Amino acid sequence: MKEQKLIHEGLITESLPNGMFQVRLDNGDLVLGYVSGRIRRSFIRILPGDRVKIEVSRYDSTRGRIIYRLRNKDSND
């Protein structure tokens, strides 16, 4: 049986080595997030200040996988 994951939205606050990021969730929690393989394969750039969707395990709520970078409303891309 597959483990249930919780999906949250948050803001990248800090970039760490090896594709890791500090993410502040909308509920105020700080989570250590790593980039999913699909984002890495598509060469999607994630920078501090970006809004992302992050998948967090129910068993370890301090780490998560970044699964989507949300588009900024004011950007031209």
From Swiss-Prot:
One CC-aspect GO term: chloroplast
Domain S1-like: 1-71
Keywords, sorted A to Z: Chloroplast, Initiation factor, Plastid, Protein biosynthesis, RNA-binding, rRNA-binding
Keyword RNA-binding: yes
InterPro entries: NA-bd_OB-fold (IPR012340), RNA-binding_domain_S1_IF1 (IPR006196), S1_domain (IPR003029), TIF_IF1 (IPR004368)
Regions that span the bilayer: none
CDD domains: S1_IF1
Chloroplast as UniProt keyword: yes
The organism's place on the tree of life at top rank: Eukaryota
Subcellular location(s) per record: Plastid, Chloroplast
Pfam families hit by this protein: eIF-1a
GO MF annotation: an example: ribosome binding
NCBIfam families found in the cross-reference section: infA
Complex formation: Component of the 30S ribosomal translation pre-initiation complex which assembles on the 30S ribosome in the order IF-2 and IF-3, IF-1 and N-formylmethionyl-tRNA(fMet); mRNA recruitment can occur at any time during PIC assembly.
Family: Belongs to the IF-1 family.
Purpose of the protein: One of the essential components for the initiation of protein synthesis. Stabilizes the binding of IF-2 and IF-3 on the 30S subunit to which N-formylmethionyl-tRNA(fMet) subsequently binds. Helps modulate mRNA selection, yielding the 30S pre-initiation complex (PIC). Upon addition of the 50S ribosomal subunit IF-1, IF-2 and IF-3 are released leaving the mature 70S translation initiation complex.
Name of this protein: Translation initiation factor IF-1, chloroplastic
Gene symbol of the encoding locus: infA
